[in-house]
């Protein structure tokens, strides 16, 4: 095997391991919380040596940022896919809410990690995660801006209310009680358009 092919194979193996590392980190952060999950736990779950984990990520906080990035990418993909069907502003918002709830309640570790409060980390990492969150929230801001509400203040309050209600479902939701679509419709029924 020539050197170029060997480097290509190493890069492919590295990429394959990266997905496993991220999945294991999301699982450990979800099950144990950020503070209690150790790099050793994550490496064990990924089937690798603890030292090998540092090849991919220099610190646990960098690994958390990568899990957040992947989690937000996944949820964003679901929400934007749900918005490809035409509909009224209210129907579009409902579709986005259903997709958000399906991601959150579908048992995926990434979504559970993303909605938790951010642990202590350096300012650059915190800014990256806040930027990712803000970019995701812009999808909902655009949908809410299309609703016939009287003021921007009402739009802001509605956005905050919806995110609080949607994200809190993970606390009280029991599988089989209601479908995410029923929950989203129920939340929207509480809000009267003016």
PLM features per residue range, with description:
Residues 1-16, 27, 86:
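N-terminal intrinsically disordered/low-complexity leader segments
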Residues 17-25, 42, 67-75, 79, ...:
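Generic hydrophobic, amphipathic alpha-helix propensity
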Residues 20, 24, 28-62, 66:
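Helix-turn-helix
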Residues 31-35, 86, 107:
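Short coil/turn segments at alpha/beta junctions that flank glycine-rich nucleotide-binding fingerprints
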Residues 70-80, 123-149, 155-160, 182-185, ...:
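Amphipathic alpha-helical packing segments from all-alpha helical-bundle domains
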Residues 92, 104-124, 171:
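Amphipathic alpha-helical segments used for helix-helix packing
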